[in-house]
Amino acid sequence: MKFELTTTDGDARRGQLTFSRGTVQTPAFMPVGTYGTVKGMLPRDIVDSGAEIILGNTFHLMLRPGTEVVKAHGDLHDFIQWQGPILTDSGGFQVFSLGDMRKISEEGVKFRSPIDGSEVFLDPEKAMQVQRDLGSDIVMIFDECTPYPATVHEARVSMELSLRWAKRSKDAHGDNPSALFGIVQGGMHESLRSESLKGLTEIGFDGYAIGGLSVGEPKEDMLRILNHLKTEMPADKPRYLMGVGKPEDLVEGVCRGIDMFDCVMPTRNARNGHLFTQAGVVKIRNAKHRHDTGPLDPTCDCYTCQNFSRAYLHHLDKCGEILGAQLNTIHNLRHYQTVMSELRAAIGKGELAQYVSHFYARQGKERPAIATQS
């Protein structure tokens, strides 16, 4: 992987990631394909959305179908018929979300499979091997996602364990030509975040992710941590904010130097009838859309908006039709890619501040005061 930074506007960055499988313009949003599928989307739909890279999940793919099935097809790209780059997360967050079903030790994590209840052990070495078998273009280290809330002591213990696992991940990654990203932890404590980042840069990685955010903390805390880290993150490496978020979170993240994002929100919300538009969120199952013959978003060029009315989408939602979830997802993912494209263009022109003002104004909102603090 090669990362080239082409333009900056304040703390915001525009660049390009180059892989053997293709190029990714940054800042970029990565649709989430947890089980090897972006829910409701054919591979060609993902391409049409403008996405250049997608995300898969090591934890879930390891449990089902298993790497042997994937390898029988070549690798994950061949299995799912997506020939662009793929980032796989290591499974640390999914293990964290198991709660009392898992037991963490220095060696790794022992847990019961949510599929059949069998005992499974996952450690940095296995996480690296699984991602190698999947053929990931970007591999994530195995870490512990610091719980929220966490005291300074609790966050420190978790962060230091993640650093030791980061070193083991790097050693196990070995001669794998794929990029390897470190993950900054430390909870909501700036000093621990700095310590985590320092430890990771001493080990040395191809990119650096910020983990442990979007785990239930107030927006103020997320922005505070991003403000703290934006001047400390290595300038020549890509920066990835994991699991974030709403369109406004992408905008605020980009303003703070983030290059990469992923989140299930556009796909999950689509299936629940919450659709993102230039004018704000549309709840398509609301009765007011029953007779609306207009498009969901007249400014959008997606297949859904170009061909179907709000009334039809409302009808599909009320009937529980699969096509409704599909058309909603096509739109939401295209909307996210449009926002990213607009951000890249604004950075390239040196007009990010104007774009941010316009982004909030077209939704009839004012930018939150906390977002303007640095």
Curated annotation (Swiss-Prot):
<dbReference type="InterPro" id="IPR004803">
    <property type="entry name" value="TGT"/>
</dbReference>
<comment type="similarity">
    <text>Belongs to the queuine tRNA-ribosyltransferase family.</text>
</comment>
<feature type="active site" description="Nucleophile">
    <location>
        <position position="262"/>
    </location>
</feature>
<dbReference type="GO" id="GO:0046872">
    <property type="term" value="F:metal ion binding"/>
</dbReference>
<keyword id="KW-0671">Queuosine biosynthesis</keyword>
<dbReference type="InterPro" id="IPR050076">
    <property type="entry name" value="ArchSynthase1/Queuine_TRR"/>
</dbReference>
<dbReference type="InterPro" id="IPR036511">
    <property type="entry name" value="TGT-like_sf"/>
</dbReference>
<feature type="binding site">
    <location>
        <position position="143"/>
    </location>
    <ligand>
        <name>substrate</name>
    </ligand>
</feature>
<comment type="subunit">
    <text>Homodimer. Within each dimer, one monomer is responsible for RNA recognition and catalysis, while the other monomer binds to the replacement base PreQ1.</text>
</comment>
<feature type="region of interest" description="RNA binding">
    <location>
        <begin position="243"/>
        <end position="249"/>
    </location>
</feature>
<dbReference type="GO" id="GO:0002099">
    <property type="term" value="P:tRNA wobble guanine modification"/>
</dbReference>
<keyword id="KW-0862">Zinc</keyword>
<keyword id="KW-0479">Metal-binding</keyword>
<feature type="binding site">
    <location>
        <position position="305"/>
    </location>
    <ligand>
        <name>Zn(2+)</name>
    </ligand>
</feature>
<feature type="binding site">
    <location>
        <position position="331"/>
    </location>
    <ligand>
        <name>Zn(2+)</name>
    </ligand>
</feature>
<feature type="region of interest" description="RNA binding; important for wobble base 34 recognition">
    <location>
        <begin position="267"/>
        <end position="271"/>
    </location>
</feature>
<feature type="binding site">
    <location>
        <position position="302"/>
    </location>
    <ligand>
        <name>Zn(2+)</name>
    </ligand>
</feature>
<feature type="binding site">
    <location>
        <position position="185"/>
    </location>
    <ligand>
        <name>substrate</name>
    </ligand>
</feature>
<feature type="active site" description="Proton acceptor">
    <location>
        <position position="89"/>
    </location>
</feature>
<keyword id="KW-0328">Glycosyltransferase</keyword>
<feature type="binding site">
    <location>
        <position position="300"/>
    </location>
    <ligand>
        <name>Zn(2+)</name>
    </ligand>
</feature>
<comment type="pathway">
    <text>tRNA modification; tRNA-queuosine biosynthesis.</text>
</comment>
<keyword id="KW-0808">Transferase</keyword>
<dbReference type="GO" id="GO:0008616">
    <property type="term" value="P:queuosine biosynthetic process"/>
</dbReference>
<feature type="binding site">
    <location>
        <begin position="89"/>
        <end position="93"/>
    </location>
    <ligand>
        <name>substrate</name>
    </ligand>
</feature>
<dbReference type="GO" id="GO:0101030">
    <property type="term" value="P:tRNA-guanine transglycosylation"/>
</dbReference>
<comment type="function">
    <text>Catalyzes the base-exchange of a guanine (G) residue with the queuine precursor 7-aminomethyl-7-deazaguanine (PreQ1) at position 34 (anticodon wobble position) in tRNAs with GU(N) anticodons (tRNA-Asp, -Asn, -His and -Tyr). Catalysis occurs through a double-displacement mechanism. The nucleophile active site attacks the C1' of nucleotide 34 to detach the guanine base from the RNA, forming a covalent enzyme-RNA intermediate. The proton acceptor active site deprotonates the incoming PreQ1, allowing a nucleophilic attack on the C1' of the ribose to form the product.</text>
</comment>
<feature type="binding site">
    <location>
        <position position="212"/>
    </location>
    <ligand>
        <name>substrate</name>
    </ligand>
</feature>
<dbReference type="InterPro" id="IPR002616">
    <property type="entry name" value="tRNA_ribo_trans-like"/>
</dbReference>
<dbReference type="GO" id="GO:0008479">
    <property type="term" value="F:tRNA-guanosine(34) queuine transglycosylase activity"/>
</dbReference>
<protein>
    <recommendedName>
        <fullName>Queuine tRNA-ribosyltransferase</fullName>
        <ecNumber>2.4.2.29</ecNumber>
    </recommendedName>
</protein>
<keyword id="KW-0819">tRNA processing</keyword>
<dbReference type="Pfam" id="PF01702">
    <property type="entry name" value="TGT"/>
</dbReference>
<dbReference type="GO" id="GO:0005829">
    <property type="term" value="C:cytosol"/>
</dbReference>
